[in-house]
Amino acid sequence: YFASQKVNEFILDLRYNNGGLLSCAELLCTMLAPSSALGQELGYLEFNNRFNPQIVPFTLNSGLIGNGANLNLNTLYVLTSSQTASASEMVINCLAPYMDVVIIGGTTVGKNVGSRNFSSPELMITMNPIVCKIYNSEGKSDYESGFQPAYSGYVVNEMSDMSRFLPFGDTNEALLSTALGAIDGSIQPPAQE
């Protein structure tokens, strides 16, 4: 749908997304990345020496899209909060080498690690221990303190002004209005020197 509407700006709202599956994040990245990046490494997982292989790469695989489309974006606007974590942060980190990722909102959690599900029906337990660290294609995984907006004008605490705590999609809602201002140029970061 988005490709048929010739979407060239995209706001991804991850403020309440505390993670999920690597495969879902990989698909999302493939749909949003510039088409020139398709087929390239998106990142890799690094496991300890008890896991073989220790390095497991993942790519911007256009085969994942199926009947969908790649939007071929150059810039992605991501709405974040203190609840944005894990796979959501992976999307930010792994797309950064290929496009401009503009963060709007609050500082994210800083969970640059992944877990695996281990179940034992006999013992009636399920565990999800941390088993790997997540890197982007440039070998970066340095977001233990979370991602934060690069420009103070993009720092938005949606709870600080309840009159702007509005339904999703309302253009007066605090984070969305800031993103729209970044897109239309009414809110600009200071000039780079």
Question: Residues of each region from the PLM?
Answer:
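C-terminal "post-core" interaction segments
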Residues: 2-9, 17-193
